[in-house]
Design a protein with these regions (language model features):
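Nucleotide-activated chemistry modules centered on ATP-dependent adenylation/adenylyltransferase
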Residues: 1-250
């Protein structure tokens, strides 16, 4: 068994453990390469069907190709696709660079706050109607208490301290000093009532592993990641005011 197979097996195991042990699960899908690999692994884990709702935070500043890709795959793969948005911040122009705040405040309003209140059910959520091919108000306002996320330990320092099953407080706060030990594939899956849980099936993957797996599995990804003949491509994807292409022939 090669290294990619080992990573895949562990991720599939964690996804199945999460689904078996936790209610009100959701999976974040940023439309980027990491969360798309996570989505692919979820399809493998459940034999082509993803029984977990996909959640996307739409800032309204995403590059158009990203939204087109999201909705196309959601229809092709029959995904339960939900998005949330901070519409009040957009209306009040608490945005960057065309509004009244800097990029950090914009990111907090359109991403962090939107995510928190979307998961809690306090703000409206919109679900894809596969028949009409439009998003409609989701009548289910029950909070998501477990969220599957495609973070990797090698991305930055704080994430290297994460766990596969990482508890948060009721306010979604992370206490790095109060994380359960995880040894020899033994994971804690029982937590106190009210605990919000983050699940990280890609924790041991590196960026190189992600690209190797995308190539091996022929996973469809956003075309922006690749040079379209102009010597430019995006290494990471996000909102267009803060995302830039790099020189590359890849």
């Amino acid at each position: 068994m090669d290294h990619l197979d080992q990573l895949e097996n562990r991720s599939v195991h964690i996804l199945r453990e999460a689904y078996a042990n936790f209610k009100n699960l959701g999976m974040l899908w940023s439309i980027g390469k990491d969360s798309t690999v996570l989505l692919w692994l979820a399809r493998k884990s459940f034999f082509g069907h993803v029984p977990i709702p996909l959640i996307h935070i739409d800032t309204s500043y995403k590059i158009p190709e990203m939204i087109e890709y999201r909705d196309r795959l959601a229809l092709e793969w029959n995904l339960t696709m939900i998005y949330g948005q901070n519409r009040q911040a957009l209306e009040e122009k608490r945005t960057f660079p065309d509004g009244a705040v800097d990029r950090i405040a914009c990111c907090k309003a359109l991403k962090t706050d939107a995510l928190k209140h979307t998961l809690s059910g306090e703000w409206p959520r919109y679900r894809l109607n596969h028949t009409k091919k439009v998003y409609e108000l989701d009548r289910n306002t029950e909070p998501f208490t477990g969220i599957i996320v495609g973070v990797r330990a090698d991305e930055e320092g704080s994430r290297s301290k994460e766990r596969y099953f990482s508890p948060r407080t009721t306010q979604s706060q992370w206490d790095v000093g109060d994380q359960p030990p995880e040894f020899w594939n033994q994971f804690k899956t029982e937590f106190a009532p009210g605990t919000h849980l983050r699940i990280h099936p890609l924790l041991d993957w590196t960026e190189l592993n992600i690209w190797e797996y995308i190539k091996r599995e022929n996973i469809p990804t956003v075309s922006l990641y690749y040079n379209q003949g102009n010597g430019k491509r995006f290494r990471s994807l996000g909102c267009y005011p803060c995302t830039y292409a790099v020189d590359s022939d890849a």
